[in-house]
């Protein structure tokens, strides 16, 4: 009888050794010097039964701070939002439970229709013409947008606002290094991109300008002013945007953005260390044949019935590797489905209401902080995040808050030396008045 987890008998081992022409395991590894081979027994615990293992793992997991027991004011790209119950039900169905797009799309019409609906909803939110089937995360989508711009314009310089998420900028740097592109950061002023600096840097060598809306500090960038500067030199205008915010803010497409990218995590995708997330990538018809990743199109079959296909596949590396628009040859189909189900369950009015609640609750929190004597660093309009001056190390504040079952905001000093002791506070629709008041009061007591 085979072991449940180790399905190899001694006979199996003998047969495998005979097949490759050796007599023993030691002979198989004879090329490895004796001096570096491990000898003796591994110092690991004895095997446990399933009930024992489950109990031990549960005890370990209980040490984590989870969002069922803690009120989270931590955002910075990953947010604690409401996910309709139906999301988990739908994505758990066996027909959908895969992260991959099919290579024989005609046999997976349901999967392709779900992706098509995702693309459609992203276009509606962003005000763009076409969206792909998703990307790994927001950082990947941003870097891919920059690569598209560099390839299209044949220019080598990329301007990115320092108010763009630091981790997305790090991904961009990695991509750019391999392509021998120059990345220039544009400083922020009063929490938004410094337009004077931007104006001085934009010239005929610039492939694109990248800003975030709302930006990393939660501030709403002046896209209309930025667009005028960017397009003077025929550079591409790339906007990274929180899709939920577009339920309340004017979409970037209305401001003349050439590419809109971001992370769909606010829609139905839980907070989890390291992902997975779901990047989105939307653009205009002018760049439809240069967009990276999968594209699902709607068509009609020989019987006149509606059908869905993977279209424009010649762009992709599994078709023409040497001429592919991107090395991305996959997507986040399962998380894209989760985002689609969440948006569908909420509906247009639900998305708008969810965005409105984020704004109103964040505004309430800001007023409470100010009433308690805290300085809210930036005075401009914001969505659901704002910066508070803690007057002391943010880590100390957050350690104290954890004792009160509160997950505090992001420590901006990790990425911006000039913002040391400043906390980025995120307030979503899930936070209650009582939780907000407790946060402010506890931080006031720590001052």
Swiss-Prot record:
CDD domains found in the cross-reference section: GDC-P
Gene designation: gcvPA
The keyword Oxidoreductase belongs to this UniProt entry's keyword annotation: yes
Protein name (Swiss-Prot/TrEMBL): Probable glycine dehydrogenase (decarboxylating) subunit 1
Record key words, sorted: Oxidoreductase
Enzyme class: oxidoreductase
GO biological process, one term: glycine decarboxylation via glycine cleavage system
Catalytic activity of the protein: N(6)-[(R)-lipoyl]-L-lysyl-[glycine-cleavage complex H protein] + glycine + H(+) = N(6)-[(R)-S(8)-aminomethyldihydrolipoyl]-L-lysyl-[glycine-cleavage complex H protein] + CO2
Pfam families: GDC-P
EC number annotated for this UniProt entry: 1.4.4.2
Keyword Metal-binding: no
Subunit structure: The glycine cleavage system is composed of four proteins: P, T, L and H. In this organism, the P 'protein' is a heterodimer of two subunits.
GO molecular function: glycine dehydrogenase (decarboxylating) activity
Gene3D superfamilies the record matches: Aspartate Aminotransferase, domain 1 (3.90.1150.10), Type I PLP-dependent aspartate aminotransferase-like (Major domain) (3.40.640.10)
Family recorded in the similarity comment: Belongs to the GcvP family. N-terminal subunit subfamily.
The protein's role, per its UniProt record: The glycine cleavage system catalyzes the degradation of glycine. The P protein binds the alpha-amino group of glycine through its pyridoxal phosphate cofactor; CO(2) is released and the remaining methylamine moiety is then transferred to the lipoamide cofactor of the H protein.
């Amino acid at each position: 009888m085979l072991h449940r987890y180790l399905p190899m008998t001694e006979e199996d081992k003998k047969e495998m050794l005979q097949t490759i022409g050796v007599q023993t395991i030691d002979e198989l590894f004879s090329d490895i010097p004796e001096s570096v081979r491990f000898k003796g027994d591994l110092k690991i615990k004895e095997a446990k039964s399933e009930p024992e293992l489950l109990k031990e793992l549960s005890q370990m997991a209980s040490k984590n701070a989870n969002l069922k027991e803690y009120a989270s004011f931590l955002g910075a790209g990953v947010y604690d939002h409401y996910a309709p119950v139906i999301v988990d039900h739908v994505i758990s169905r066996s027909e959908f439970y895969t992260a991959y797009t099919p290579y024989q799309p005609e046999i997976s019409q349901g999967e392709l229709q779900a992706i098509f609906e995702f693309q459609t909803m992203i276009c509606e939110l962003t005000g763009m013409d076409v969206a792909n089937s998703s990307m790994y995360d927001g950082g990947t989508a941003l870097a891919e947008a920059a690569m598209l711009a560099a390839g299209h314009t044949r220019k080598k310089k990329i301007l990115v606002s320092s108010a763009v998420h630091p981790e997305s900028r790090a991904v961009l740097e990695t991509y750019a290094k391999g392509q021998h592109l120059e990345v220039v950061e544009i400083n922020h002023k009063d929490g938004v991109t410094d337009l004077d600096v931007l104006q001085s840097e934009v010239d005929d060598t610039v492939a694109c300008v990248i800003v975030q809306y709302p930006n990393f500090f939660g501030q709403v960038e002046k896209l209309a002013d930025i667009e005028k500067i960017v397009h003077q030199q025929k550079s591409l205008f790339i906007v990274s945007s929180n899709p939920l915010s577009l339920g309340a803010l004017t979409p970037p497409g209305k401001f003349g953005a050439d590419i809109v990218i971001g992370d769909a995590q606010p829609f139905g995708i839980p907070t989890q260390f390291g992902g997975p997330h779901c990047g989105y990538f939307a653009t205009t018809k002018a760049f439809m044949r240069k967009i990276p990743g999968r594209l699902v199109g709607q068509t009609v079959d020989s019987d006149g019935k509606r059908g869905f296909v993977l279209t424009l596949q010649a762009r992709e590396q599994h078709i023409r590797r040497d001429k592919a628009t991107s090395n991305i040859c996959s997507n986040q189909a399962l998380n894209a489905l989760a985002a689609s189900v969440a948006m569908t369950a909420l509906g247009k009015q639900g998305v708008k209401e969810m965005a409105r609640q984020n704004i109103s609750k964040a505004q309430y929190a800001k007023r409470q902080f100010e009433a308690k004597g805290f300085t809210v660093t930036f005075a401009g309009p914001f969505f659901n995040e704002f910066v508070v001056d803690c007057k002391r190390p943010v880590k100390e504040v957050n350690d104290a808050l954890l004792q009160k079952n509160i997950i505090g905001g992001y420590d901006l000093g990790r990425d911006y030396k000039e913002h040391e002791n400043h906390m980025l506070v995120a307030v979503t629709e899930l936070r209650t008045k009582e939780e907000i008041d407790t946060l402010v009061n506890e931080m006031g007591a720590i001052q």
